[in-house]
C-alpha cells in the first residue's frame, strides 16, 4: 500500500464516508484525478468491503474522446467492474455539461441502486472554486469552497480527495484533456494563469486557501447554531426573533435563509432592502422574481411559490351560479372591461369617497395575499376588487335595468374569501 493510499484509507475511515457493503458509483472522466481515485478504490475494495461501478460521460469535444471511451470500457471489462456511458448532447456550456452529468449520475444512482456517488475533486479544484467565487463577488457562505459530502439522489455525493494536492495523485495511466490547458474558460484562466503567479508569492498558497475555507466553515457553523435557535415553522422565520438579533447576525441569518433556495439570485441592493423591510413593523408582500413572492406578516417572513393561476386568478360567469362564493358585480352595458392586478395610484370610490387602494386595504385590514386580487375596470374606472368589494359605481347600477352582471370569485383559496367577510 502506497503512502497516498494509506492517507486515503485513513481519511475514509476517520470521516466515515461509507460503510462496508456500500454500493459506490465513481464519476470517471479518464483524467489523472478520477483514474487515481479508481485505482485506490479498486486496490482497496476488499479492505473497504465495497461494490464499485463507473459512470463516464463522453462530451464529444475532442477527437480523442471516442478512443478514451473505448479504452475505459475495455479496462472496466477486463477488471470486471460495471461501467455506464452516456454521450453529451445539446449546446455545450460548462453549466449545461455539468447539469447533464449530474442528471445521468442521478438516474444511475436510482436505477442501479447505488447509495454513494464519488467524484475526484481535489484541493486544487477547491482553491479554484474559492477564487472564482471571490473574484465574482459571492458572499462569505460560498467561500467555504466545495463540500466534502452532501445528499444526492437518495444517497450521498462524496468528494474524498479534497485534502489531496494534484501532486499526490499517482495514476500512471490516464487521459489528458487538452482543453484544460486553454484559456477559453474562467476556471482555466484561474488554474493556468492566476494561481501560478500567486504561488510565486507564497508557495503554500493553495494550502492557505484550503485552510481559509476550513476557517470559514467553522465560523459559519457558529452562525448556523444561532440560526437553529430561531423560531422556524414550515420554513417561516419568526420576525420577532429575527429582529432581536444583532444587525451583523441578521445579515448572516438572511443569507442562510436564501441559501435554501439556490435557484434564487438576490442582488446586494435587494438584500439590503429586505433586511430593512423585515425590521419595519409593516407587513410586506411582493414578487421577488418570476417564481417566488417574499412575504412578511406580523409574525413571520417567508417565501411563497407563485402559482400560475395567480396571474389570472378569477373565475367569471354571466349567469347566476347560485353559489355564495361568487360575488355579484354590476357593470354598465357599454364600455371595455379590463381585468388586471393593482398598480400604484389605483383608487376606489367607496361610501361616497375616493380612496387609494393602499389605504383601503390598510383600513380594512385586508391580508397581504388578498391585496393581489384582480381588479375589474370599465373604461378605466374601478368597479370591483374580486372577492373583496364593489365600488359605489357598481352598487349604483344594482337597480338599473340597463346593465351587465358578472358573477366572479378569486381562485386562490379560502383566505381571500375570509378577507371579503371582514371588509
Swiss-Prot record:
Can you tell which superkingdom this protein's organism belongs to? Bacteria
Protein name, UniProt field:
tRNA(Ile)-lysidine synthase
SUPFAM superfamilies in the cross-refs: Adenine nucleotide alpha hydrolases-like, PheT/TilS domain
Annotated EC: 6.3.4.19
GO biological process terms, semicolon-separated: tRNA modification
Signal peptide region: none
UniProt note: domains = The N-terminal region contains the highly conserved SGGXDS motif, predicted to be a P-loop motif involved in ATP binding.
Q: Which organism is it from?
A: Lactococcus lactis subsp. lactis (strain IL1403)
Subcellular location(s): the record lists:
Cytoplasm
Q: Which residues bind ATP?
A: 29-34
Which controlled-vocabulary keywords does the entry list? ATP-binding, Cytoplasm, Ligase, Nucleotide-binding, tRNA processing
Q: In its keyword annotation, does this UniProt entry include Ligase?
A: yes
**InterPro entries given for it?**
Lysidine-tRNA-synth_C, Rossmann-like_a/b/a_fold, TilS/TtcA_N, tRNA_Ile_lys_synt, tRNA_Ile_lys_synt_N
Q: Which reaction does it catalyse?
A: cytidine(34) in tRNA(Ile2) + L-lysine + ATP = lysidine(34) in tRNA(Ile2) + AMP + diphosphate + H(+)
Homology family: Belongs to the tRNA(Ile)-lysidine synthase family.
Its GO CC terms? cytoplasm
GO terms (molecular function) for this protein are:
ATP binding; tRNA(Ile)-lysidine synthase activity
Where does this chain mainly localize?
Answer: cytoplasm
Role description: Ligates lysine onto the cytidine present at position 34 of the AUA codon-specific tRNA(Ile) that contains the anticodon CAU, in an ATP-dependent manner. Cytidine is converted to lysidine, thus changing the amino acid specificity of the tRNA from methionine to isoleucine.
